[in-house]
Amino acid sequence: MKAGWCAALVVALAGCGSIGPARMVQPAGLEARTVEVTIDGMGGGTRGSFQVAGNTGRYSRAASRLDLFDELLAFDKGGAEFTVRGPDFPEPVTARCGFRQTTSTIRIVEFTPKKFSYECSYEGLQGARFVLQEAAPVGGVSTLKAERRGEFMSSGRVYTVRSVHDAVGGIVPLAAPLGYVVDTAGTSIASVELNGLTPALRLPSSPASQGERRDVLLIALSLAVLWDPAAR
């Protein structure tokens, strides 16, 4: 299963030749009010160490797929864990995450009896929780996009997270998420790009609250460590 995710990354890189992976479209004005940092070390491996914005940590992850009756039924599941410490985390925070999804393919039509669902809990940050799920089709019309929507809750703050499928210069949206945008109070405050081997995060230049920068970092790490079956 590890090979499947690595292959997807190679395709993403190779498809763009020497110019690198496709960049996701950012919300209007977001680049002007954020600073870009990278999540180094959390590429395609199953475990290792990472660095982001002066913080460091270690991660591990796994994913599997069970096909029954020649893909009539397919069960995807996986889990991940990371611990981060540093200037934004005086007390280390450990995240434990897991996802599940069941799909069914009849001829060329794919159904999802159990839709994608991903959840993270956090030790060291009381009450924090992240839930990401497959989004309901707009207007009830299904598309090829594996759209995701979610919420991160921490100390009374609520952030909404939504997947982005449009690439800069692209003509049609991609099926798998290129990355995610983080919103709060109806305003986009951050984003994380996942296409390629080094996730790129846009952090708020002037966080609205003391914990906002920390929360955005946790959201980004929780997304970067996920092996989404849509990217298979």
Each language-model region and where it sits:
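Sec-dependent signal peptide recognition
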Residues: K2-A8
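C-terminal motif of bacterial Sec signal peptides marking the signal peptidase cleavage site
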Residues: L13-G15
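Intrinsically disordered, low-complexity proline/glycine-rich segments
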Residues: G17-R232
